[in-house]
């Protein structure tokens, strides 16, 4: 879950500090909330196929209930090593059979919901993560692998690549001559595109579901990775930073919805319509007491925007398509309330 969509009403229960045990420390969080439908329809809802079949089928007008759980474990024998498990379940409120469905993330993470009508089957996601912080080396690596339409660990072990996605990244700090100043180098790869065998055979993709056709959204916006279903993103970050400031460059390459691309164009064997964005920008922040100001400027070059690449007879196969340039500016201001707990935490640091 990310901040790609606007917020929604929810209840959150979480540990305020790690729970110590003989084998290490545990932390956890449970969330339950209501997801709403989009208030907007596609631009063209009357188009038909063969003058008989409507291409647009309205979504079900019903609210959805989302429940999720995250558990983190840090073994006491390895400093800086963390393991995590996350599970999310969403279903229509009208399909909830009893009060237990409101706690689905706690009760059915390992249950396949066998015997349930397919039209009432929930949309489920699960992931395992690992993060390792090397304090002396001022570096960390992290990985999270997830399954869309999670059907239990047996199915995961049999076909782990089916409906799978992952995030892999690392960050490293290098000391600069000036005390408490660092050069930060980071790289991250996000892969949500499915293997072509599965995406073509099942018309399936991350964040999409045949029963809950709204997908993993709130008001039509993805509440998962902002790149959306079927997409891949590679990011490189190079920045100068200290305790109060950060300024640096960012490079990105995004492949838009490869699952849709193969579904729409594979039968034509037209491999020259990939929609790819290349971005370069400057980002940073400054901290002034309890006030934080963040900003980013990005220049985005879109190749074959919206998968459009028209060629006239005689034109070379590889050539300019619907290529566009876009500038993106982002500015945010955050004020941290000087709570007593936060002041005590800062004194302890």
Segments the model singles out, each with a brief description of its role:
Residues 1-84:
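Internal, well-ordered domain-core segments that constitute the primary functional module
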Residues 74-349:
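Exposed, low-structure sequence patches enriched in small/polar residues
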């Amino acid at each position: 879950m990310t901040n790609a969509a606007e917020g929604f009403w929810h209840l959150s229960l979480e540990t305020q500090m790690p729970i110590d045990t003989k084998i290490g420390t545990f932390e956890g969080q449970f969330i339950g909330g209501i997801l709403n439908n989009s208030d907007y329809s596609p631009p063209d809802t009357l188009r038909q196929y063969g003058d008989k079949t409507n291409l647009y089928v309205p979504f079900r007008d019903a609210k959805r209930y989302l429940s999720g759980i995250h558990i983190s474990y840090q073994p006491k024998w390895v400093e800086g090593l963390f393991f995590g498990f996350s599970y999310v379940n969403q279903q229509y409120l009208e399909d909830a059979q009893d009060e237990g469905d409101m706690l689905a993330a706690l009760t059915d993470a390992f249950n396949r919901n066998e015997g349930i009508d397919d039209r009432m089957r929930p949309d489920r996601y699960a992931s395992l993560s690992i993060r390792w912080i090397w304090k002396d080396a001022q570096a960390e690596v992290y990985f999270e692998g997830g399954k869309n339409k999670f059907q239990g660990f047996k199915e995961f072990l049999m076909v782990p690549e089916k409906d799978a996605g992952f995030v892999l990244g690392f960050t490293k700090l290098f000391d600069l001559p000036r005390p408490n100043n660092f050069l930060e180098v980071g790289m991250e790869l996000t892969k949500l595109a499915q293997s072509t065998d599965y995406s073509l055979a099942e018309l399936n993709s991350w964040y999409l579901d045949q029963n809950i056709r709204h997908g993993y959204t709130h008001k039509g916006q993805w509440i998962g990775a902002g790149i959306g279903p079927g997409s891949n993103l590679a990011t490189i970050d190079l920045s100068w930073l200290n305790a109060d400031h950060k300024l640096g460059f960012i490079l990105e390459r995004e492949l838009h919805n490869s699952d849709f691309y193969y579904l729409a164009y594979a039968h034509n064997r037209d491999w020259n319509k990939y929609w790819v964005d290349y971005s370069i920008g400057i980002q940073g922040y400054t901290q002034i007491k309890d006030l934080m100001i963040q900003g980013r400027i990005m220049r985005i070059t879109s190749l074959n925007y919206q998968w459009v690449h028209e060629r006239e007879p005689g034109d070379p196969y590889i050539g300019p398509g619907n290529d566009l340039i876009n500038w993106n500016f982002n500015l945010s201001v955050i004020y941290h309330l000087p709570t007593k707990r936060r002041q005590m935490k800062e004194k302890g640091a």
